[in-house]
């Protein structure tokens, strides 16, 4: 029996999950979990990338302690951030987080030189200041000139493990530098940044064998002999692979620190309507495209908890929230002011004050406000998606950590007026494992993998119901007018 390890690292935590296929059912075991985050060093918010590597080795040692001598391994992480590699193969600096303030106004500045419509027509990617395009636009020229290669985070981890440099396509598409038509890094865009296209590794599809873990790591650490497979390395791409969807008329919501809501399509949509609504066409596994909107997620709730010194669990916060009427206060969760404020609670209160609403005071009121606002935003985006694609959405599959928030799932079902299916919460790791198993011939296809997922995990169901959607939508429009 083959053993598979998913290295799944998000913005706030990481985990190594052991998976195997037994009687057409996936069995998972969490082997190691660790915290992730950025710290302010050398003038920027930076990831502790060396510590992440150490956590991976600790996890792999735990795998071997189970008596597993050989395994297959895949890596997925968050998108857009990168590591600059020098001529000798060394890391030039710890990577800067997408939440760093260096890219403030970068979109505006670059698009004043290079029209938005032109960039969108080429790439089909949503305009966000965190995109790699804008990070490189403001990167220190000295570092860029010294860099031989630019590797996104999961590709860097794969490189450290195997010595092989690649640019996996699902994650590379998040950079806003891939040309949709040519299926390559766009030389014209890169030349505008004075970056040679050769600084990027060869584009590689999800499901491609990368290589064996280097001998030096086997000697330094007591870990299994691992074959590394390049999975869908962008965590959302893996989460979509891990979505237990069936049929055609469905949408997905990968709910975690961010909310990524969209549809899986066979061709991109980069027309005027998609451009106007700032939709993105991220590449998916096996020739698909993730037509989606990247919006705020549970980050706001996580920050409320942090400001409260974690006195309440997330379950307790949701329970407290249920004691208040929904939609008493509505915030625009996608407002940039909520990206990384000094104090999230104060920012929400100030927003409500500025928009003529009552100010939420308790932990329950604040949580109620955020969950209601998120559900409203989801429903509005599903409405826009239907208009742009011309496809009727009948089901929404919510995966990731947010699939455990029953209150948010039920509010979304009511506002959107469609059935909502929630789970699995570990869809990203599951999608990672499924791609490995397809590579190894244990699963035939992504469709077959999704059937196995449906048979392996409990999926929650939430029915649509009556709600004052149009009235709430009108109130939200008035709130936006204050801005």
From Swiss-Prot:
Record-listed E.C. numbers: 2.7.1.5
Enzyme class: transferase
Entry-linked Pfam families: FGGY_C, FGGY_N
Keyword Magnesium: yes
Cofactor list: Mg(2+)
Catalytic activity: L-rhamnulose + ATP = L-rhamnulose 1-phosphate + ADP + H(+)
InterPro entries according to UniProt: ATPase_NBD, FGGY_C, FGGY_N, Rhamnulokinase
Pathway participation: Carbohydrate degradation; L-rhamnose degradation; glycerone phosphate from L-rhamnose: step 2/3
GO BP, one annotated term: glycerol metabolic process
Disulfide bonds: 352-369
Keyword Ribonucleoprotein appears in the UniProt entry: no
Sequence positions that bind substrate: 79, 234-236, 294
GO molecular function, one term: ATP binding
Family: Belongs to the rhamnulokinase family.
Function: Involved in the catabolism of L-rhamnose (6-deoxy-L-mannose). Catalyzes the transfer of the gamma-phosphate group from ATP to the 1-hydroxyl group of L-rhamnulose to yield L-rhamnulose 1-phosphate.
PANTHER family the UniProt entry points to: L-RHAMNULOKINASE, SUGAR KINASE
Name of the protein: Rhamnulokinase
Designated gene of the protein: rhaB
């Amino acid at each position: 029996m083959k053993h598979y390890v998913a290295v799944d690292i998000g913005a706030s935590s990481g985990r190594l999950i052991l998976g195997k296929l037994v009687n057409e059912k996936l069995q998972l075991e969490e082997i190691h979990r660790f915290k992730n985050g950025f710290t302010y060093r050398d003038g920027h918010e930076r990831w502790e990338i060396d510590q992440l590597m150490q956590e991976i080795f600790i996890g792999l040692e735990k795998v071997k302690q189970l008596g597993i001598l050989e395994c297959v391994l895949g890596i997925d992480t968050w998108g857009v951030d990168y590591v600059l590699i020098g001529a000798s193969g060394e890391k030039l600096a710890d990577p800067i987080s997408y939440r760093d303030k260096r890219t403030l106004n970068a979109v505006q500045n670059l698009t004043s030189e290079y029209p938005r419509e032109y960039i969108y027509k080429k790439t089909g990617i949503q305009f966000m200041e965190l995109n790699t395009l804008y990070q490189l636009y403001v990167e220190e020229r000295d570092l860029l000139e010294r860099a031989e290669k630019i590797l996104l985070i999961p590709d860097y981890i794969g490189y450290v493990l195997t010595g092989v440099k690649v640019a996996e396509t699902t994650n590379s598409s998040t950079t806003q530098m891939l040309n949709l038509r040519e299926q390559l890094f766009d030389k014209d865009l890169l030349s505008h940044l004075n970056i040679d296209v050769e600084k990027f590794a060869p584009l590689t599809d999800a499901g491609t064998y990368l290589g064996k873990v280097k001998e030096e790591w086997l000697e330094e650490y007591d870990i299994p002999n691992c074959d590394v497979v390049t999975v869908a390395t962008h965590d959302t791409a893996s989460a979509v692979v891990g979505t237990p969807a069936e049929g055609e008329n469905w949408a997905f919501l990968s709910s975690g620190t961010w909310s990524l809501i969209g549809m899986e399509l066979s061709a991109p949509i980069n027309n005027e309507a998609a451009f106007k609504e700032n939709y993105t066409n991220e590449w998916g596994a096996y020739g698909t495209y993730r037509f989606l909107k990247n919006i705020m997620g549970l980050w706001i709730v996580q920050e409320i908890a942090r400001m409260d010194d974690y006195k309440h669990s997330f379950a307790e916060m949701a329970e407290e929230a249920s004691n208040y009427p929904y939609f008493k206060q509505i915030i625009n969760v996608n407002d940039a002011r909520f990206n990384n404020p000094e104090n999230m609670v104060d920012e929400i209160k100030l927003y409500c004050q500025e928009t003529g609403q009552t100010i939420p005071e308790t932990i329950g009121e604040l949580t109620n406000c955020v969950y209601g606002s998120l559900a409203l935003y989801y429903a509005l985006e599903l409405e826009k998606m239907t208009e742009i694609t011309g496809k009727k959405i009948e089901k929404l599959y919510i995966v990731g950590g947010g699939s455990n928030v029953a209150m948010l799932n039920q509010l979304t079902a009511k506002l959107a007026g469609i059935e909502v299916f929630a789970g699995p919460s570990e869809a990203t790791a599951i999608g990672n494992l499924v791609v490995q198993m397809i590579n190894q011939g244990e699963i035939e296809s992504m469709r077959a993998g999704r059937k196995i997922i449906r048979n392996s995990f409990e999926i929650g169901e939430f029915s649509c119901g009556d709600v004052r959607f149009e009235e709430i939508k009108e109130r939200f429009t008035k709130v936006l007018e204050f801005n």
